[in-house]
Amino acid sequence: MRIGRNLVKMDVDMLRTVEASRYVVPLREGGSLPAVVEADDDALYVMKFVGAGQGPKALIAELIAGEIGRALGLNVPELVFMELSPLLSRTERDEEILDLLRASVGLNLGMRFLPGAFAYNSLLQPPPAADLASAIVW
């Protein structure tokens, strides 16, 4: 990725593409209904769906933000393109999830699932190191 005058140019060939093989569990946080999904490389990913309410622009923003964070030296989980087959929805019973899966067939965005990770909470102790906090805020 190269960052220059109000322009972010990314070489998307640097991202691997994996095939979603199993829908594990929805993450009912946020508006996009991401899910933990197993891929054909036997790894778990948090999949962000192109068919979610925010649409494909939200995934593009997440991809760009993740790669900018990586370029700045922040620890960012691996980002991958995830192919979603229409066959993955055949056993889903939840109508909302089923609609999302059907609307998201094709290319989506995934990030490596981090077991034991949790959302940032400023009340948790100890706070992040000052140099890490300043790098994130920058």
Language-model regions: role of each:
Residues 115-138:
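Conserved kinase catalytic-core segment
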Residues 7-123:
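Conserved ATP-binding subdomain of kinase catalytic cores across diverse folds
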